[in-house]
């Protein structure tokens, strides 16, 4: 059997060299551990930046740092009072705004028409994306769920949608 080399270390690479034209707007996430998970996803896919809104943990934060494993130092993060404030900022910079939520009219992520640059709004673990933020979206993306629960962990959801965006920018 042929030997396989597994990359075990981190690599130095300038962030600005190949940033994915995606911003993640975190709307009132209550778990700093989930926020750290989103930072790991964002760094792996080279997401342009993260907008932490409301009471969402923002670096530096001890619990966030535990799951971010250093990615909080590699991904730009800005704090906004509300998701609506973040939407206004990114829309003024030409971003198309998508709510990642199980709402009527949402397109499953693999069929969704996604225009870049885009901002993806990810909502609170129990409450979802706020009504105010939903009202400001240009479109909606969802992950189908066939079990009893109508959602998956926000960090896992971020991974699925962000890597779908990455795939589309690479093809």
Map each language-model feature to its residues.
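Post-transcriptional modification and biogenesis factors for structured RNAs
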Residues: 1-171
